[in-house]
Curated annotation (Swiss-Prot):
Variant or mutagenesis effect after changing residue 81 to A: Abolishes ATPase activity
Phenotypic consequence of residue 83 to A: Abolishes ATPase activity
Annotated consequence of substituting residue 227 to F: Prevents phosphorylation and increases ATPase activity
Pfam families reported in the protein's UniProt record: AAA_31
Keyword Thylakoid appears in the UniProt entry: no
Gene3D superfamilies found in the cross-reference section: P-loop containing nucleotide triphosphate hydrolases
Family: Belongs to the CpsD/CapB family.
Reactions catalysed according to its record: L-tyrosyl-[protein] + ATP = O-phospho-L-tyrosyl-[protein] + ADP + H(+)
Effect after changing residue 228 to F: Prevents phosphorylation and increases ATPase activity
Residue numbers carrying Phosphotyrosine: 228
Full protein name: Tyrosine-protein kinase YwqD
Gene: ywqD
C-alpha cells in the first residue's frame, strides 16, 4: 500500500499544470496547447492521442498536463486512459479504477457512469478500468469507435493516453480514432532511430501526426521537470 501511495504522489507532483499553474513548466504546456489548436487549419481538433516511442518517456505526464491546460481554458475536457497494460492516469488524479474504459467496452457500464470528475474544473477522467487479458482486441472493437464518437460529441476536447507505439499495437489501433496524434520523446533517452520508427508507425496507421514534444530538457536551473514545448520544439511533420 505504501508503494502505491508513493507512486500516486509522484504522479500528482508531475501534474504541474494543476499544482503549480504559474510555473515555467506549466507555461510550456500552454504553449503546446496553442500549437495543437493551430496544427490543423482545415478543421477543429476534437481529439488527440498522446503516445511515445518507448516506455518511460513521459507520455502519461504529458497527457495529464495537456488535459489540465485545455480545461483551464474553459473547455470541457475528457482524459481517457487507453493504456490498458500499465495505466497511471487514476494515480495522477487520485481516482478509483474499479470501473473505467474496459467496463464501457465490455458493456458493463455506460460512459456517463464510468467517467469521474477530477479536482480540476472542466476536466473529467475515464480511467482504464480493470486490466483485460486482450487489450488490443478491445481497443479495435466497434465499441471503441462508438465511445470515441460519443466522447467527442459530449466534450470540447478528448485526450487519449495510449501505450508506447513501438511496444505494442494498441496505439496504432487508436491512431485513426483520434483527430491527431502527438509523439513524446525524451531528451537523452529516445534514440533517433526509435523516434523515426515511431513516426513511421503513426504514418502506417494513417494517424495525423501533429508534432513531437521533447520531454526532459532542462529549461533553467530552477526547472524541476525541464519541459521543452516552444514552437521550435513542437515539430511539424
Amino acid at each position: 500500500m505504501a508503494l502505491r501511495k508513493n507512486r500516486g504522489s509522484r504522479m500528482q507532483r508531475n501534474v504541474i499544470a494543476m499544482t503549480e499553474p504559474k510555473s515555467l513548466n506549466s507555461e510550456q504546456y500552454r504553449t503546446i496547447r496553442t500549437n495543437i489548436e493551430f496544427a490543423s487549419v482545415d478543421r477543429q481538433m476534437k481529439s488527440v492521442m498522446i503516445t511515445s516511442a518507448c516506455p518511460g518517456e513521459g507520455k502519461s505526464t504529458t497527457a495529464a498536463n495537456l488535459a489540465v491546460v485545455f480545461a483551464q481554458q474553459g473547455k470541457k475536457v475528457l482524459l481517457i486512459d487507453a493504456d490498458l497494460r500499465k495505466p497511471t492516469v487514476h494515480t495522477a488524479f487520485f481516482l478509483e479504477n474499479t470501473v473505467g474504459l474496459t467496463s464501457v467496452l465490455l458493456k458493463k457500464s455506460s460512459m456517463e457512469q464510468a467517467v469521474q470528475a477530477s479536482n480540476e474544473k472542466h476536466l473529467d477522467v475515464l480511467t482504464s478500468g480493470p486490466i483485460p487479458p486482450n487489450p488490443a482486441e478491445l481497443l479495435s472493437s466497434k465499441w471503441m469507435k462508438e465511445l470515441a464518437y460519443e466522447a467527442c460529441a459530449a466534450y470540447d476536447m478528448v485526450i487519449f493516453d495510449t501505450p508506447p507505439i513501438l511496444a505494442v499495437a494498441d496505439a496504432q489501433i487508436l491512431g485513426n480514432v483520434a483527430d491527431g496524434s502527438v509523439l513524446v520523446i525524451s531528451s537523452g533517452k529516445t534514440e533517433k532511430e526509435q523516434a523515426a520508427k515511431a513516426k513511421e508507425a503513426l504514418a502506417t496507421c494513417k494517424s495525423k501526426l501533429l508534432g513531437a514534444i521533447m520531454n526532459g530538457k532542462k529549461l533553467s536551473k530552477h526547472s524541476e521537470y525541464g519541459y521543452y514545448g516552444t514552437k521550435d520544439n513542437f515539430m511539424q511533420k
